[in-house]
Amino acid sequence: MYHPRVQGVRVGQTLEVRNSDATLHNIHSLSTKGSGFNVGQPLAGMVYKYQLKAEEVMLHVKCDVHSWMTGYLGVVPHPYFAVTDAAGTFTIANVPAGKQTVQVWHEQYGALAQTVDVKAGGTTTVEFAYTGNEKPSQTAFAVQELVVPVDATAVQLIASRRRD
C-alpha cells in the first residue's frame, strides 16, 4: 500500500518510494503535467527517487500489478497545505494575511474552493461540506483524507465529508 495514501508535498521535493516486500510492484504516476513515470520494483528494499517538478493537484500514483495500491500527492509550490485528521479537520499555520483561496480535494468527490480573508495575528475558520452532488471522480474508493492547498498567523479549517 502507498502510505500515507494522500499527502501534500512541495514542488522540487524528492518523492521516495520503497518496495517493502518480496513482491513485484511498479510505481506509475498518472501525471497530467508531464511529470509522469512508470518504474518497476521487482525486489524487496528497492527505492525509487523522483524529483517532483511541477505543481499538480492531485498527482495519482498507482501500482499496475496490484489495482488496490493507489495514492495521491498534492504537489504545490508553497508550504501551505495539510491533510485532514480522522475527524476531517486540519490547521495550516503562518498563512500570510490577506485574501487567500483555500481548496480541498476528495478522492471521490473532487475539489471545492473558497476565498477567505486572513487577518494578521488571528484565526480564520472555513467550513467545507460535500453534498454528494459533486461529480464523482474516476475512482470508486472513498478515503478519509482531504488535501488542502492554500494559495499564498494561523488558519483553522474544517472540512466536512459527506456522510452516507
Language model features with spans:
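Extracytoplasmic copper-binding redox domains, predominantly the cupredoxin/blue-copper superfamily
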Residues: 1-164
